[in-house]
Curated annotation (Swiss-Prot):
This is Protein CfxQ homolog. One of its GO terms (cellular component) is chloroplast. One of its GO terms (molecular function) is ATP binding. Keywords: ATP-binding, Chloroplast, Nucleotide-binding, Plastid. It is found in: Plastid, Chloroplast. Transmembrane segments: none annotated. It comes from Cyanidium caldarium. InterPro entries: AAA+_ATPase (IPR003593), AAA_lid_6 (IPR041627), ATPase_AAA_core (IPR003959), CbxX/CfqX_mono (IPR000470), CbxX/CfxQ (IPR000641), CbxX/CfxQ_RuBisCO_ESX (IPR050773), P-loop_NTPase (IPR027417). The lineage of its organism: Eukaryota, Rhodophyta, Bangiophyceae, Cyanidiales, Cyanidiaceae. Belongs to the CbxX/CfxQ family.
């Protein structure tokens, strides 16, 4: 039942809502601050998440003062290349939804096609339903969601999983939020082929590629967490490494940076182990030199 003009007028005149106080109660700012600290760059993504959080908060305040409106669509699409923070942002989004009482538990369940689709008749439905059962009350994050749909194979069971997801998205919106993720071009085709699903996804967040300088900062942050550091020369060499690696196949942004760091640590350990003097300082153990990076195959091709 909607609010009459008279009732709305009374609400406007006599109901005061302290927006800052309500915002502080939710502790959403803590989540947004964590997002800023944990993720380098990605300003458009952070702004979009803040916009979604603002919509959800205002919707809750409207309900509080008796204003009627349909619930905002909560299902989302995260598009962008791998290693750009989609899973991290999904975790924070789950926390925001929980703090605003849109979901009951606030946990994140991450899956791919293999977790949902069976290999024979009658196998897909129980697999998908089991995943949904685990995710209820939280957020289900489906990575590389486009692999659910294989139009060139009429016997593929992915379409069965999609049908079950559609039913849950429509009928259990209060119990579960689904985030579909993957490369933008492939996700666009996926939605075009599944208009029923696309119409139920209200929030789209595009994750851009990192710039080389941002990836260097990510590397330094990863190293700092492990109590390592790069020399100034090593910083320049690592930046050069990133630029070269970005031109190679299967580049995965922060994931590729993490892999490069792991290999640099291995070379660093071998260099330390092979020192003529077996007495090493704390600085020796924590400092990665340019040579630890220059031994990469990228510099030898």
């Amino acid at each position: 039942m909607g609010i009459t003009p008279t009732a709305l007028e009374k609400t406007d005149k006599h109901t005061l809502v302290n927006l800052q106080e309500e915002f502080n109660k939710t502790k959403i700012q803590e989540v947004l601050d964590d997002l800023n600290q944990e993720l380098i760059g990605l300003k458009p993504v952070k702004n979009r998440i803040r916009e979604i959080a603002a919509l959800l908060l205002v919707d809750r305040l409207r309900q509080k003062v008796g204003l009627s409106s349909s619930n905002p669509g909560l299902h989302m699409s995260f598009t962008g290349p791998p290693g750009t923070g989609k899973t991290t942002v999904a975790t924070k989004m789950a926390d925001i939804l929980y703090k605003l009482n849109y979901i009951k538990k606030g946990h994140l369940v991450t899956v791919t096609r293999d977790d949902l689709v069976g290999q024979y008749i009658g196998h897909t439905a129980p697999k998908t339903k089991e995943v949904l059962k685990k995710a209820m009350g939280g957020v289900l994050f489906i990575d590389e969601a486009y692999y659910l749909y294989k139009p060139d194979n009429e016997r593929d069971y992915g379409s069965e999983a999609i049908e079950i997801l559609l039913q849950v998205m429509e009928n259990q919106r209060e119990d579960l939020v689904i985030i579909f993720a993957g490369y933008k071009e492939k996700m666009d085709k996926f939605y075009a082929s599944n208009p029923g699903l696309a119409s139920r996804v209200a929030n789209h967040v595009d994750f851009p590629e990192y710039r080389p300088e941002e990836l260097l900062k990510i590397a330094e942050m990863m190293l700092q967490e492990q109590q390592y550091q790069l020399t100034k020369e090593a910083e320049l060499v690592f930046l050069d490494y990133i630029k070269k690696r970005m031109l190679q196949p299967h580049f995965a942004n922060a994931r590729s940076v993490r892999n490069a760091i792991d290999r640099a640590r291995m070379r660093h350990a071998n260099r330390i182990f092979n020192l003529s003097s077996k007495i090493v300082t704390k600085s020796n153990l924590t400092t990665i030199q340019a040579e630890d990076i220059l031994k990469s195959r990228l510099f030898n091709t």
